[in-house]
């Protein structure tokens, strides 16, 4: 079996390798691919032009005095890569029946496709991290091979990020008499539009569900809408739809990612409550693929470019790599209100 063509790889990754990520599925449903390395923010909506404030990040500190507003932004370039070696094909794979060992050609195919899955997952983690931080804070940090780390700030109003103050903490309220409805309504009123979904971690859910008056108003019999069902598909182990609180869909999320140090961490910090709308106009933007082979094949404006190649030598070496230049854009960060619950 020879090398996979780009068309075969694109077909495989688009149809077989799908990793659903909660915030991307709910709030960033539209995709815009650019033929240029830069993303033109003022061309992605038919409404008010979008701009972002970009600041350098030096030694972990955001230097806003050295930043400026821009409508043209170059995304960080992501290109996870794997090497396949001959020894992997002759050794038994996990799960193989020793009495029915697969031939090396089958193992090679299985390992290559698994590598493609890992590369896709690595890129989705980058996209979801951008999406989550854009929703939580109205900004995120981004880095790439050809530039230093920067902060991309879409201009969230300070009033839309709330920390429960002294005397207002839900953890200190009476479980039998306190009604959180008033607080939730006040929070929702700060959003620039209607709020129809509340996403929270397990800590916030336990607090809310501990209030008798909250439980009495929670409608667990009404099913979730089709959009929400699509978003949480394949995430049943880490995302749970609890019901409706009035018109507010209540969702508990325990989605996680693997950090650079190899430790699994949650996307949502402890005690975080996110109020938003599933009609939010978040956009998945992608800069051009920066690969000469991609250019020769006519694959320039694309969210992904998977490739598979051999290097001639003694011995020859075989690789897979998936390239992407993602930039998650949140035109109206004030559509969301984020509460640090205490």
Curated annotation (Swiss-Prot):
<comment type="function">
    <text>Assembles to form an icosahedral capsid with a T=7 symmetry. The icosahedral capsid is about 60 nm in diameter and composed of 415 major capsid proteins. The assembly is primed by the interaction between capsid assembly protease and portal dodecamer, and major capsid proteins assemble cooperatively to form the procapsid with the help of capsid scaffolding protein. Major capsid protein forms hexons and pentons of the icosahedron. Viral genomic DNA is packaged into the procapsid through the portal vertex. The packaging triggers a dramatic reconfiguration of the capsid shell.</text>
</comment>
<protein>
    <recommendedName>
        <fullName>Major capsid protein</fullName>
    </recommendedName>
</protein>
<keyword id="KW-0167">Capsid protein</keyword>
<keyword id="KW-1145">T=7 icosahedral capsid protein</keyword>
<keyword id="KW-0946">Virion</keyword>
<dbReference type="Pfam" id="PF03864">
    <property type="entry name" value="Phage_cap_E"/>
</dbReference>
<keyword id="KW-0426">Late protein</keyword>
<dbReference type="GO" id="GO:0039620">
    <property type="term" value="C:T=7 icosahedral viral capsid"/>
</dbReference>
<dbReference type="InterPro" id="IPR005564">
    <property type="entry name" value="Major_capsid_GpE"/>
</dbReference>
<comment type="similarity">
    <text>Belongs to the lambda phage major capsid protein family.</text>
</comment>
<dbReference type="GO" id="GO:0030430">
    <property type="term" value="C:host cell cytoplasm"/>
</dbReference>
<comment type="subunit">
    <text>Homomultimer.</text>
</comment>
<keyword id="KW-1035">Host cytoplasm</keyword>
């Amino acid at each position: 079996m020879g090398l996979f063509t780009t068309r075969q790889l694109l077909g495989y990754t688009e149809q077989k390798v799908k990793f659903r990520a909660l915030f991307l599925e709910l709030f960033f449903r539209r995709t815009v691919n650019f033929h240029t390395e830069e993303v033109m923010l003022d061309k992605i909506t038919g409404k008010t032009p979008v701009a972002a404030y970009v600041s350098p990040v030096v030694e972990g500190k955001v230097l806003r005095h050295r930043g400026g507003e821009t409508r043209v932004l170059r995304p960080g370039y992501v290109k996870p890569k794997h090497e396949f070696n001959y020894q992997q094909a002759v050794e038994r794979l996990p799960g193989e029946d020793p009495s029915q060992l697969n031939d090396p050609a089958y193992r090679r195919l299985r390992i290559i496709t698994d590598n493609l899955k890992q590369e896709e997952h690595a890129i989705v983690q980058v996209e979801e991290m951008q999406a989550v931080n854009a929703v939580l804070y109205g900004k995120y940090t981004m880095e790439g091979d050809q530039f230093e780390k920067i902060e991309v700030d879409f201009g969230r109003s300070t009033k839309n990020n709330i920390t429960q103050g002294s005397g207002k903490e839900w953890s200190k309220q009476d479980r039998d008499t306190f009604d959180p409805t008033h607080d939730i309504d006040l929070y929702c009123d700060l959003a620039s539009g209607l709020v129809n979904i509340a996403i929270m971690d397990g800590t916030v859910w336990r607090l809310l569900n501990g209030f008798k008056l909250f439980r009495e108003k929670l409608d667990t019999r009404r099913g979730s809408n089709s959009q929400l069902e699509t978003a949480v598909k394949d995430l049943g182990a880490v995302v749970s739809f609890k019901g409706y609180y009035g018109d507010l869909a209540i969702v508990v999320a325990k989605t996680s990612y693997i950090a650079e140090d190899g430790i699994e961490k949650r996307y949502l910090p402890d005690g975080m409550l996110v109020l938003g709308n599933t009609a939010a106009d978040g956009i998945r933007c992608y800069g051009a693929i920066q690969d000469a082979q991609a250019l020769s094949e006519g694959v320039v404006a694309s969210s992904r470019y998977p490739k598979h190649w051999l290097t001639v030598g003694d011995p020859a070496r075989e690789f897979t790599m998936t390239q992407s230049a993602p930039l998650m854009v949140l035109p109206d960060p004030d559509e969301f209100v984020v509460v640090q619950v205490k």
